């Protein structure tokens, strides 16, 4: 019988696209809404569906992951980068280079299709040129 050793910590971190650790988020002034995630990882290449009823926090969670908002506690790493540790300008650049999101309240180019609207920020990101 063969046993396989778990990958070294560095290898596991490189395989991780998203790592959420001990996140706690509350909207200011709203004690009834809270997102708490103790631990959650998504590997590179893994697909994920975020499904829930209206008001359950899906858009808020995406805003935390892509750095539009920051949590009061915890850590979110995307491709090994701690999102909250970045300045607001650095988060904006990182989001433009690594994310394609259309939220509920969106501004689309009316002459472009959905894919072109999602990909537009990538064409404006310096790292993509």
Tell me the role of every PLM-derived stretch:
Residues 112-121:
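Short coil-to-helix segment of the ABC ATPase nucleotide-binding domain corresponding to the Q-loop/switch region
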Residues 11-17, 25-38, 88:
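A short, flexible loop at the N-terminus of ABC-type nucleotide-binding domains that lies
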Residues 48-50, 62:
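Short hydrophobic beta-strand immediately N-terminal to the Walker A/P-loop
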Residues 66:
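Helix-to-loop junction immediately C-terminal to a conserved catalytic motif
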Residues 74-82:
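Conserved ABC transporter NBD signature motif
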Residues 89, 116, 125-129:
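Short coil-to-helix "N-cap" segments within the ABC nucleotide-binding domain's helical subdomain
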Residues 53-56:
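Walker A (P-loop) phosphate-binding loop of ABC-type ATPase nucleotide-binding domains
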Residues 83-100:
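ABC ATPase NBD coupling module
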């Amino acid at each position: 019988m063969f046993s396989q050793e778990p990958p070294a910590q560095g290898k596991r971190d490189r395989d991780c696209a998203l790592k959420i650790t001990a996140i706690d988020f509350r909207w200011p002034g709203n004690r009834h809404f809270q997102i708490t995630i103790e631990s959650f990882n998504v590997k590179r290449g893994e697909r994920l569906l975020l499904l829930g009823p209206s008001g359950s926090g899906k858009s808020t969670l995406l805003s935390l992951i892509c750095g539009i908002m920051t949590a009061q506690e915890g850590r979110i790493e995307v491709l090994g980068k701690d999102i909250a540790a970045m300045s607001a300008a650095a988060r904006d650049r990182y989001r433009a280079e690594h994310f394609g999101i259309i939220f509920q309240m969106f501004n689309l180019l009316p002459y472009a299709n959905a894919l072109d609207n999602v990909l537009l920020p990538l064409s404006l990101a310096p790292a993509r040129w």
